[in-house]
Amino acid sequence: LLGTSTPMPVADPLLTAARGNHHDAIDMANTWSHSSFGLMGGNEIPGMCMTMGGQRLLERSKDDVFFTDLNACNEFINGAELAQKITVATLVVFANQDKMTAAVNAMEVAETIPNCRTVRLQPCGHSMLSEQPNAVLDALKTIV
């Protein structure tokens, strides 16, 4: 599980903007999804900008896709109860500067799952696949 939380509430301004397919939703999510490291550049590839990559990815989404995703997160219930029923080895990867799903919430999810390990990424925000792709891959290799 990457950047998880239960419950997973979505801020009303973000949900409202996404419902109307307003670019403000992309701006908010993109800003909140990156650590201070990611917001200042931080990409190992010269000339690549993580925030612009995130923006362009969300801009390519069809209308209502982003809202549907955020709304599903916002309405997800019984996560802790369901997590206790997981019977396979599980890995929770979380980021120290995640503003979308706080690290403390990810650790709480991990504590409810039997046979669960955790990996904390730093410096990193919710967009861990763009900020720390190699660290995510290294973590995933330990579970597959």
Residue ranges and their predicted role:
Residues 7-10, 16-85:
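Conserved alpha/beta-hydrolase catalytic His-Asp/Glu region
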Residues 1-7:
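A conserved short beta-strand
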Residues 99-105:
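Conserved alpha/beta-hydrolase "acid-adjacent" motif
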Residues 86, 92-94, 98:
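Short beta-strand/loop motif that positions the catalytic acidic residue
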Residues 83-87, 111-113:
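Short, conserved loop/helix-junction motifs that constitute active-site signature segments
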Residues 114-144:
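Catalytic active-site module of serine/aspartate enzymes centered on a nucleophile-bearing elbow/loop
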Residues 4, 73, 123:
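Active-site loop/turn elements of alpha/beta-hydrolase fold enzymes
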Residues 107-108, 134:
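Active-site phosphate/pyrophosphate- and oxyanion-stabilizing loops and adjacent acidic/basic residues
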